[in-house]
Amino acid sequence: MNRILSGSCLVFLLIFGLSCSKTKEKLTEFDIDYTNTLTVPASSYTVDVPAEFLTPEIPTESESKFSAQKTAKDHIDEIKMTRFNISVSSGDLSVLKSIDIYLKSTGQSDVLIASKSNIGSGVTSTSADLKDVNIKNYIFNDKIQFKVRLLIGGGSSFNQQIKMDQTIHVKAKLIK
């Protein structure tokens, strides 16, 4: 009886052990940086009324960037914005009451990805507050664009080139 019980346990452990020896998928994580500039002419807004501006389209180059990391579009789990810095080379950002940044891409709805309000006096650079949004379907497209909604307060005129630096973080499985 003990032999049968021992044999049954051995067979069970062998079958269970083999079924659990599934190969784990190898994962990778990496960052991609983008930079673009938005021109805000002084004549294009009214004080205390939101004004919207579009950046030029930005090539994502996602296929080549994924390939360089040994992954592909169908292996991507998530892509999230991890940094969105806003800066000006002359003057400052203090005339801005708030800024909302939306991501645009063909076939996708505009999505709010970052915002900033209460920008201090004399500030020439600030980090936007990021939203927790998976933007992988936007980055899969060939080009992205930002729609920027500014609320400009009173004071001096705001005629600026706003530099925007972004970092996205990609989580993916490696191609076997």
Label the predicted regions.
Residues 16-19:
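C-terminal motif of bacterial Sec signal peptides marking the signal peptidase cleavage site
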Residues 40-77:
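Post-signal-peptide N-terminal segment of Sec-exported extracytoplasmic proteins
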Residues 126-167:
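Cysteine-clustered segments with highest specificity for TGF-beta superfamily mature ligands
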Residues 93-109:
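Short, surface-exposed beta-strand/strand-loop-strand elements in extracellular ectodomains
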Residues 21-24:
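Bacterial signal peptide processing site
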Residues 1-9:
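Bacterial N-terminal signal peptides that target proteins for export
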Residues 87-97, 154-157:
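Extended, low-complexity, turn-rich repeat/linker tracts enriched in Gly/Pro/Ser/Thr and Asp/Glu
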Residues 77-91:
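A short beta-strand element within beta-rich, extracytoplasmic domains
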